[in-house]
A protein has these predicted regions:
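Short, structured beta-strand-loop surface elements
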Residues: 46-128
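Alpha-helical protein-protein interaction elements
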Residues: 5, 11, 34, 91, ...
Length: 128
C-alpha cells in the first residue's frame, strides 16, 4: 500500500470524503502531505469534516482539482484521527513544506485570524 501512499502524497489536491451519521458522503478538496506512514490534512477545528471524523473515522481519498472535481486514480479508503497540538504543529510544517510559499503564507494568515488553536491536523492511515 506504500505506492498508494506515495501516489496520494504527490497530488496537489485530494478529495477527502467524510460521512454523516446518516451515511451520506460529504466530499471536500484538501491539501495533504505525507508525514511518516500517514497522510496529514490541516483544517479549521470547527469544520464539518472534523466533526464528522469524530463521529465516524472512515474516509475516502482520490486525486482532484482545486474545486473538488476528481481527476484520476482509484478511490482509497482510510481511517482518520484528530491530532493533538504536537501532531497539528507537525502537520502545519509538512503542509508548509510541500506547498512552499503559498503554504507558508496560508499558515501565516491563519495564525493572524485566530491563532494556532483555531486549526487542527488530521492524520489518515490508508494501510488498513
Amino acid at each position: 500500500m506504500g505506492t498508494e501512499l506515495e501516489r496520494l502524497a504527490a497530488e496537489k489536491y485530494l478529495l477527502l470524503t467524510t460521512f454523516r451519521k446518516s451515511g451520506d458522503a460529504v466530499p471536500t478538496p484538501v491539501w495533504a502531505a505525507r508525514l511518516g506512514d500517514e497522510l496529514v490534512v490541516w483544517s479549521e477545528r470547527a469544520a464539518g469534516k472534523v466533526k464528522r471524523i469524530r463521529a465516524d473515522n472512515q474516509v475516502e481519498l482520490v486525486a482532484c482539482d482545486v474545486r473538488g472535481k476528481r481527476t484520476h486514480g482509484q478511490t482509497v479508503r482510510g481511517k482518520a484521527r484528530i491530532l493533538d497540538d504536537e501532531g497539528t504543529a507537525a502537520t502545519r510544517e509538512a503542509i508548509a513544506g510541500k506547498y512552499g510559499i503559498v503554504g507558508k503564507v496560508t499558515m501565516f494568515f491563519s495564525r493572524l485570524r485566530g491563532g494556532p488553536r483555531r486549526t487542527v491536523g488530521l492524520a489518515i492511515d490508508i494501510t488498513n
